[in-house]
Curated annotation (Swiss-Prot):
UniProt source species: Thermoproteus tenax virus 1 (strain KRA1)
Protein name: Uncharacterized 16.5 kDa protein
Domain of life (superkingdom): Viruses
Amino acid sequence: MITSNITTNAINQVDPKAVQTGLKIFRILKKIREGQVDVNEIDSLPFAKEFYIKTGRSLGKLIQDMMGSDPDKALELFLGAFMRGEELNKAIQFHKELIAELSKEDGADLCTKVNRVLEKYGSRIDCENAEMSVEMAERLVREIIE
């Protein structure tokens, strides 16, 4: 349960397809980190082919940029597809902070790590009663760009 306010207006401004695309990309990144997917084989995945048809961009190249030479530019291009101006800057900053926190190996669970970042933005999740699900991830994205 998210304990800060989420306005209906903010929720309606988020493109659910963009949120789903973002979640799929982050799932692919997780699989790469776990060694389940080779970064050079990304473009052969069904989602990557769909991504190329819709955007004209190589998902493999985008993910390589996110992981390698220019991660900030790749992230800005990716988020810029559905955010502008201050929303974009806030989303990029939040993403950087979240990735840094999730990368720490301090024994904390996922919910606790997410809360460390959310608290900087005046929000938090009730870890006792929360399951980190796709639905919760969508709510987090919506809340952060509010």
